[in-house]
Swiss-Prot record:
<dbReference type="GO" id="GO:0000122">
    <property type="term" value="P:negative regulation of transcription by RNA polymerase II"/>
</dbReference>
<dbReference type="GO" id="GO:0061629">
    <property type="term" value="F:RNA polymerase II-specific DNA-binding transcription factor binding"/>
</dbReference>
<feature type="domain" description="Orange">
    <location>
        <begin position="122"/>
        <end position="157"/>
    </location>
</feature>
<dbReference type="GO" id="GO:0003151">
    <property type="term" value="P:outflow tract morphogenesis"/>
</dbReference>
<dbReference type="GO" id="GO:0051145">
    <property type="term" value="P:smooth muscle cell differentiation"/>
</dbReference>
<dbReference type="GO" id="GO:0051151">
    <property type="term" value="P:negative regulation of smooth muscle cell differentiation"/>
</dbReference>
<dbReference type="GO" id="GO:0061156">
    <property type="term" value="P:pulmonary artery morphogenesis"/>
</dbReference>
<dbReference type="GO" id="GO:0045944">
    <property type="term" value="P:positive regulation of transcription by RNA polymerase II"/>
</dbReference>
<dbReference type="GO" id="GO:0010659">
    <property type="term" value="P:cardiac muscle cell apoptotic process"/>
</dbReference>
<dbReference type="GO" id="GO:0010667">
    <property type="term" value="P:negative regulation of cardiac muscle cell apoptotic process"/>
</dbReference>
<dbReference type="InterPro" id="IPR050370">
    <property type="entry name" value="HES_HEY"/>
</dbReference>
<dbReference type="GO" id="GO:0007219">
    <property type="term" value="P:Notch signaling pathway"/>
</dbReference>
<dbReference type="GO" id="GO:2000678">
    <property type="term" value="P:negative regulation of transcription regulatory region DNA binding"/>
</dbReference>
<dbReference type="GO" id="GO:0001570">
    <property type="term" value="P:vasculogenesis"/>
</dbReference>
<dbReference type="GO" id="GO:0045165">
    <property type="term" value="P:cell fate commitment"/>
</dbReference>
<dbReference type="GO" id="GO:0035912">
    <property type="term" value="P:dorsal aorta morphogenesis"/>
</dbReference>
<dbReference type="GO" id="GO:0060948">
    <property type="term" value="P:cardiac vascular smooth muscle cell development"/>
</dbReference>
Amino acid sequence: MKRPCEETTSESDMDETIDVGSENNYSGQSTSSVIRLNSPTTTSQIMARKKRRGIIEKRRRDRINNSLSELRRLVPTAFEKQGSAKLEKAEILQMTVDHLKMLQATGGKGYFDAHALAMDFMSIGFRECLTEVARYLSSVEGLDSSDPLRVRLVSHLSTCATQREAAAMTSSMAHHHHPLHPHHWAAAFHHLPAALLQPNGLHASESTPCRLSTTSEVPPAHGSALLTATFAHADSALRMPSTGSVAPCVPPLSTSLLSLSATVHAAAAAATAAAHSFPLSFAGAFPMLPPNAAAAVAAATAISPPLSVSATSSPQQTSSGTNNKPYRPWGTEVGAF
């Protein structure tokens, strides 16, 4: 007869049976079976089994932690909050559930789009930079929340963030509703000068000479030179004052930044699509801009002040240099807005 050992575990492959002999055997055989039960070999097997169980448990915990780390990195809400405080496992799982519900509500097209995901992470990074700027002003510069310089700077950065998000949303909707076809690059730049020059109050007759022709009017080989001329003319028209009045030669920040960032982003996307569909060489006249370069151009345009603002702020910077104060160029620029 076989009787199972008392030291059993939940693992079925580790179960063992020990032969204790028949009932009609003499007592010496049962004594030997008890000795076998308490032998060093059985003790070592039990210890090895416990060690294997600990290793398996550690691997299971490591898999759970790695999966939670991936969820914290992939879910935008959890990624935004991971710098401020340590997230618990329950919070990460709850954010993941909310994110999946949002994807289900939008038909599964939300963050599976690479462009939408990139723009979302860019806006999150801009908000994080805004938080760090506010912390720097309070801890290093010693400016409290009621200081007018800090209020203007934080308000300006918040406005820029809102405008960038609105421009990104507009360009994303235009990208989904109007897919690029082989001749879409000329149509994308067709209305660029008019969109840039209308806020300055110029007439339609002044903006028509710099209008781009379509592909039927101009050969594709000269398209790059025309695009470069268009950007140069638009930039000069934005910065040159009108002859009639000295007042507002530059559009407000809310309109110029929104229109310029949207048009530059659309221009970069159209030029990238044209590079894949046309056997042209743009190396000589028009450099190819990836989407991240377009975002950098929009950011540089938002940071750089207009010509009139720089001219008025230069005496203030000279006077501040004579007083041995720290050089803060953004102080006067933000005040102009």
